[in-house]
Amino acid sequence: MIFDTHAHYDDEQFDGDRDELLKSMPDLGVGTIVDVSATYESCEKVLTLAGKYPHVYAAIGVHPDEVGELNEDKIQHMKELCCNKKVVAVGEIGLDYYWDNEPHEVQQKWFIRQLELAGEVKKPVIIHSREAAADTMYIMKNYAQGLGGVIHCYSYSREMAEEYVKMGFYIGIGGVVTFKNAKKLKDVAAAIPIEKIVLETDCPYMAPEPYRGKRNQSSYIQYVAEKIAELKAMSPEEVIAVTEKNARDLYGI
């Protein structure tokens, strides 16, 4: 079944039909979802969702755009939340120089601290990196050794993807791979072994064709699987089966 390794069902875009939608997912071919926090406040929300639905798990972390609100007391509270058996990762954490909401040194400080948190609680990490390739790689090489995890919504070169794979990380691929202009990501998807790829939505964002621009949901991963299958001369069913196993290995589910 489909394993959505990165979703945001706590987002307000789902306020009108969240319960109905999440309950329907197994009937739509979706076996497992990891709901990923982006703000400190959403850490509690993703855990509540994970507690309510057997097929939903949680990741605890603060997105680089939101790290200005962090302090050590909040990190300690996040550490306590990570003890819950439904928490499978620390994330999403990283660097975002595209939006540049926080100074680079502030982003880097809290990225490193959350990598340390992952080491303390022995969880893999979900990495967000946008227009920050070199700094992300430098920090990962120095602070993420042995953690394991996924480079979410991968957007860099094939060579850098291969480097992350050598470091023990999976490459997260979502709806962008279905876009006509996504040549670089298609090259990455074709080159990286299927055993090192996991599928994701980033819903409600990043919907694949034919739903581009609409609200995304986990069942739409079928379109991502079909595109990767085409690039790799596999069947979509094989892609879904292998990436589900990869995700279970990644998150220890």
Where are these regions (language model features)?
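Mid-domain alpha/beta scaffold segments of enzyme catalytic cores
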Residues: 1-253
